[in-house]
């Protein structure tokens, strides 16, 4: 006895997949590949009323048949909230469907898992190194220990030049005759250094 069209439509869903009365939609856990829902590719010109044919669309069914679009039970999946049918699904080279990622630009941070840093990461590293070099090359007034060392070196150089010139002009007699002058000159340089620090 031939089945009524209403019975045929109740056993076959909108996409052409045959449903048994006791069959329930598979519950997929989040993250499972959606290619587990294999569907037949519909043939709109199949026979619509044979006794042995319970689906209007005749197409090969089996685990190797490629799915044309996500099944009708994708709407019942919790993942459907975040996708719109087949518009966000793309097929990779392995044949599985996966979600497309958003096309936002790369973040300004380094990915430590890659060996070669990306161009934004290289620019960010260059910026950080430039800022570090500018911080190290501060003026002498900002770093008192360097300024004191420079002043002491300058005082020593001036003292050596003055002492050598004086000894040369006086034929080695000035240093021996006037040791107080040398000490006073050195004290004058130290007082000038302390005065500049305040």
From Swiss-Prot:
Keywords per UniProt: Apoptosis, Membrane, Mitochondrion, Phosphoprotein, Ubl conjugation
UniProt entry tagged with the keyword Transmembrane: no
Induction comment: By ER stress in a DDIT3/CHOP-dependent manner.
Name of this chain's protein: Bcl-2-like protein 11
Chain location of the short sequence motif BH3 per the record: 148-162
Family: Belongs to the Bcl-2 family.
Domain free text: The BH3 motif is required for interaction with Bcl-2 proteins and cytotoxicity.
Functional note: Induces apoptosis and anoikis. Isoform BimL is more potent than isoform BimEL. Isoform Bim-alpha1, isoform Bim-alpha2 and isoform Bim-alpha3 induce apoptosis, although less potent than isoform BimEL, isoform BimL and isoform BimS. Isoform Bim-gamma induces apoptosis. Isoform Bim-alpha3 induces apoptosis possibly through a caspase-mediated pathway. Isoform BimAC and isoform BimABC lack the ability to induce apoptosis.
Organ and tissue specificity: Isoform BimEL, isoform BimL and isoform BimS are the predominant isoforms and are widely expressed with tissue-specific variation. Isoform Bim-gamma is most abundantly expressed in small intestine and colon, and in lower levels in spleen, prostate, testis, heart, liver and kidney.
A GO MF label: protein kinase binding
Modified residues (Phosphoserine): 69, 77, 87, 94
InterPro entries linked to this entry: Apoptosis_Bim_N (IPR014771), Bcl-2-like_11 (IPR017288), Bcl-x_interacting_BH3_dom (IPR015040), Immune_Signaling-Apoptosis_Reg (IPR052133)
Localization per record: Endomembrane system
One Pfam family hit: Bim_N
Biological-process GO terms, alphabetical: apoptotic process; apoptotic process involved in embryonic digit morphogenesis; B cell homeostasis; cell-matrix adhesion; cellular response to glucocorticoid stimulus; developmental pigmentation; ear development; extrinsic apoptotic signaling pathway in absence of ligand
Membrane topology according to the record: Peripheral membrane protein
Reported impact of residue 156 to E: Abolishes induction of apoptosis. Abolishes interaction with BAX and BCL2; in isoform Bim-alpha3 and isoform BimS. Loses the ability to induce the conformationally active form of BAX
Subunit composition and interactions: Forms heterodimers with a number of antiapoptotic Bcl-2 proteins, including MCL1, BCL2, BCL2L1 isoform Bcl-X(L), BCL2A1/BFL-1, BHRF1, and BCL2L2/BCLW. Does not heterodimerize with proapoptotic proteins such as BAD, BOK or BAK. Identified in a complex containing BCL2L11, DYNLL1 and BCL2L1 isoform Bcl-X(L); BH3 integrity is required for BCL2L1-binding. Interacts with YWHAZ. When phosphorylated, interacts with TRIM2; this interaction is associated with ubiquitination and degradation. Interacts with MCL1; may sequester BCL2L11 to prevent its pro-apoptotic activity. Interacts with GIMAP5.
Gene Ontology CC entries for this record: Bcl-2 family protein complex; BIM-BCL-2 complex; BIM-BCL-xl complex; cytosol; endomembrane system; mitochondrial outer membrane; mitochondrion
Modification comment: Phosphorylation at Ser-69 by MAPK1/MAPK3 leads to interaction with TRIM2 and polyubiquitination, followed by proteasomal degradation. Deubiquitination catalyzed by USP27X stabilizes the protein. Ubiquitination by TRIM2 following phosphorylation by MAPK1/MAPK3 leads to proteasomal degradation. Conversely, deubiquitination catalyzed by USP27X stabilizes the protein.
Region Disordered, annotated ranges: 1-72
């Amino acid at each position: 006895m031939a089945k009524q069209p209403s019975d045929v439509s109740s056993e076959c869903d909108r996409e052409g997949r045959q449903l048994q009365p006791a069959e329930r939609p598979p519950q997929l856990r989040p993250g499972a590949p959606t290619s587990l829902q294999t569907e037949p590719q519909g043939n709109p010109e199949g026979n619509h009323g044979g006794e042995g044919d319970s689906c209007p669309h005749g197409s090969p069914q089996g685990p190797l048949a490629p799915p044309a679009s996500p099944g009708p039970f994708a709407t019942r999946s919790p993942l459907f909230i975040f996708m719109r049918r087949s518009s966000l699904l793309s097929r990779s080279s392995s044949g599985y469907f996966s979600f497309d990622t958003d096309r936002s630009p790369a973040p300004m941070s380094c990915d430590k898992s890659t060996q070669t840093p990306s161009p934004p990461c290289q620019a960010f590293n260059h910026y950080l190194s430039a800022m570090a070099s500018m911080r190290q090359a501060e003026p002498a007034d900002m770093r008192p220990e360097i300024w004191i060392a420079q002043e002491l070196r300058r005082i020593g150089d001036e003292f050596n030049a003055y002492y050598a010139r004086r000894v040369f002009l006086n034929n080695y007699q000035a240093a021996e005759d006037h040791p107080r002058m040398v000490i006073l000159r050195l004290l004058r340089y130290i007082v000038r250094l302390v005065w500049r620090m305040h």
